Regions:
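N-terminal localization/anchoring segments of enzymes in phospholipid and broader phosphate metabolism
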Residues: 1-527, 545-549, 561-585, 589-675
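Hydrophobic alpha/beta core scaffold segments
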Residues: 552-556
Length: 675
């Protein structure tokens, strides 16, 4: 028997749980639409990275197997088979929600169902807003198929010259920055591509439009960087980002159009790829025909529309922790260590702390890691302001996938302001989230640290659940000082910390040691691990051994889980759960009954434990330890948003009509009650 679930199929199962949220009839309609948007965006990234990587392994005949022993070709086939039915489910769900929205006055209307007055408005919109922005190509002997960037959205048409009767093909690119949903009247929307399609004869004069289809391509978007050859890492990353849009096509999505037109488009793309990538045979791309609009990720335009608030869940306002109500945040932290649970407790104190430090004359230095900070960052702006007055050192991780460009921009801005900027660590990704502020008061140096499971991004802090920790304890600060020194000197793998634990050297051995300690207690042992993913085979094997010793193990794994629970003789004492709800579960909390409870930036994956700089933080303060344990206990009682994984890889929603509990709703109400 195979001891592990396949990584890729386990991720797809997570995305299925996201799709299930869109099916939840208890949710407001735009909330359901939001989950369809998330589902599609997730799948885009899965194809850009995971499927693209498997294709590379297959095409280069690299004998690499998944944790379950499946080779790349087998995994690609399993992915295609898994999605074949689910894509149809997604389409049906969209059509159901679309019909319900129509009854509420939000109408996504096909162009051919518009009346004459509405079509006149669409024509005006085309002339004023779209005509100058679309890029039409007539494909003939002098105009070959152009390169298509990742996530290109376009129309492909068969056209006939009215004079010569010659039939040819045309490509019309639609820019990504246009509004997809055009509101012709209050609540009446038509898709931009349908407006363009209806006016193609204005782009191809003296031609008759015979057939047309919308299509979208997804390309390999992984960035390969040879760090050994990098003299200017920022410049190398900048050049690599320019190449991202030139990746090989891995997925084709089409809508409408005849089978003949579809075959012509597919053949054209394959021919283009064969010549562009100099392959002996056309590359195999996954091709899907859609009965609904392409790219449901654009549904965010409707979800965020200001006119339909009654169709959305009410906004929750995060609460300010009472200990941060004082004007001087540093005094609050000096009094006691504090732990916040975002988004229920506000992220504002983190931003305020940096802003206060930047303007405080007693501040000597600020050291910080930045992983994903977003395009509009008050934190970076505060650091830029501080850099003109005090010592500011920032480690900006340029390898944060899909945030490379934003991070590069902020790194350059910080450098211009006078900050010392380090672009990551050689062959490691810095994923630890840490901040160290040093002040001088009463002729003494005082250190303040902030450590977190989540990013320094106020926007994501409103939708991701994370814990963040504030301390003025010297033993913690000393470890962080040591770690920053090692990062600045590129010797991260050689640092041994005293209070905290750091990957790639310390976290995995520590977790294994903690599992072994619970094994010594046999049936009295108890482990709860909450993470985004569990993939590391060594950790999984130790959990199997602990189960066989009688240790009770509860795993709360939001996404990928390669461990097989409830297998007789292997994992009978292991239960695996996943919570998918309004907020994205992102905190990593690790509880060991006979030792301690920890929080971490690291998931239980080889990349986190072996190829990244991560932190594992013990909760030595009893109040903080109890708060972390309370989070786990409530999530294990969830009967509305919790799924359980069985030994066959199936997820089933946990239900108890007599005791309904949504853990995320509970924490919202608890925050209101407490504060």
């Amino acid at each position: 028997m195979n001891r592990f679930f396949n990584r890729e199929l386990s991720w797809l199962a997570f995305n299925t749980r996201v799709l299930n949220e869109a099916k939840d009839e208890s949710l407001p309609l735009l909330e359901r639409l939001k989950f369809l948007a998330i589902y599609d965006t997730n799948l885009d990234e899965f194809y850009m990275i995971r499927v693209a990587g498997l294709k590379q392994l297959y095409e280069h005949k690299i004998a690499s197997k998944g944790i379950d022993g499946a080779n790349p070709e087998e995994q690609l086939e399993k992915i295609k088979h898994y999605l074949a039915h689910e894509i149809e489910e997604r389409e049906l769900e969209f059509q159901k929600i679309q019909a319900l929205l129509f009854k509420k006055g939000l109408c996504i209307t096909p162009y051919n169902e518009l009346n004459l007055e509405q079509k006149a408005k669409a024509k005006t919109y085309f002339k004023e807003q779209l005509y100058a922005l679309v890029l039409p190509f007539k494909l003939d002997s002098s105009h070959t198929f152009p390169p298509l960037a990742n996530l290109t959205f376009a129309l492909f048409a068969r056209i006939k010259d009215k004079e010569t009767q010659t039939i040819s093909y045309a490509l019309i690119k639609l820019p990504s920055f246009i509004f997809r949903f055009v509101e012709l009247e209050k609540g009446l929307f038509v898709l931009a591509e349908e407006i363009v399609e209806a006016h193609l004869e204005e782009l191809f004069l003296e031609h008759e439009i015979l057939d047309c289809m919308a299509f979208r391509v997804t390309c390999d978007a992984d960035i390969a960087i040879t760090e050994d050859e990098a003299h200017d890492y920022a410049d190398l990353m900048s050049k690599s980002l320019r190449k991202r849009n030139q990746g090989e096509i891995v997925r084709l999505q089409t809508q409408k159009g005849s089978q003949e037109l579809f075959k012509t488009l597919l053949a054209s793309l394959r021919s283009f790829q064969t010549h562009s990538y100099k392959k002996h045979k056309p590359t195999g791309m996954h091709a899907y025909k859609s009965a609904i609009m392409l790219n449901l990720g654009d549904l965010w335009e409707l979800v965020n529309h200001s006119d339909f608030k009654t169709l959305k869940s009410p906004n929750f306002t995060p609460k300010i922790h009472p200990h941060f109500n004082e004007n001087d945040l540093f005094k609050s932290i000096e009094k006691q260590d504090l732990l916040l649970f975002h988004p229920y407790e506000s992220f504002e104190p983190v931003v305020d702390l940096i802003e206060q430090a930047a303007s405080d004359p007693t501040t000597l230095s600020i050291k910080m890691t930045l992983y994903r900070v977003g395009k509009h960052s008050p934190i970076v702006k505060a650091l830029i302001e501080a850099a003109s007055k005090i010592q500011v050192s920032v480690l900006v991780e340029l390898k944060a996938r899909f945030d490379e460009e934003s991070n590069l921009h902020w790194a350059k801005a910080l450098e211009r302001a006078g900050a010392l900027v380090v672009y990551g660590v050689f062959k490691l990704k810095v994923h630890a989230k840490m901040l160290l502020i040093t002040k001088k008061t009463d002729n003494q140096l005082r250190h303040f640290t902030h450590l977190s499971t989540g990013n320094y991004n106020p926007l994501s802090a409103k939708v991701y659940t994370d814990v963040s920790f504030f301390s003025a304890k010297n033993e913690i600060a000393n470890d962080i000082i040591k770690l920053f020194h090692s990062l600045l000197t590129s010797s991260a793998t050689n640092s041994a910390l005293e209070t905290l634990f750091m990957a790639p050297k310390q976290i995995k051995p520590k977790i294994i040691e903690l599992i072994q300690n619970e094994m010594n207690h046999k049936q009295e042992g108890y482990i709860i691990l909450k993470a985004n993913a569990l993939v590391d085979s060594e950790i999984i094997e130790w959990l199997y051994q602990a189960s066989q010793k009688g240790v009770k193990i509860d795993l709360i794994i939001r996404g990928i889980c390669c461990l097989k629970p409830q297998v007789k003789g292997l994992s009978e004492n292991i239960r695996v759960y996943s919570i998918v709800g309004k907020y994205l579960e992102h905190a990593r909390i690790y509880y060991f009954k006979h030792e301690n409870i920890y929080f971490s930036s690291a998931d239980l994956m080889p990349r986190n434990l072996e190829r990244r700089v991560e932190l594992l933080v013990p909760a030595t303060n009893p109040k903080i330890a109890n708060k972390l344990l309370h989070i786990l206990e409530i999530q294990l009682k969830d009967t509305l948003k919790r799924y359980e994984l069985d030994s066959k890889g199936r997820y089933t929603k946990v239900s108890n009509p007599n005791d309904p509990l949504n853990s995320q709703d509970y924490f919202e109400k608890q925050a209101l009650k407490t504060f």
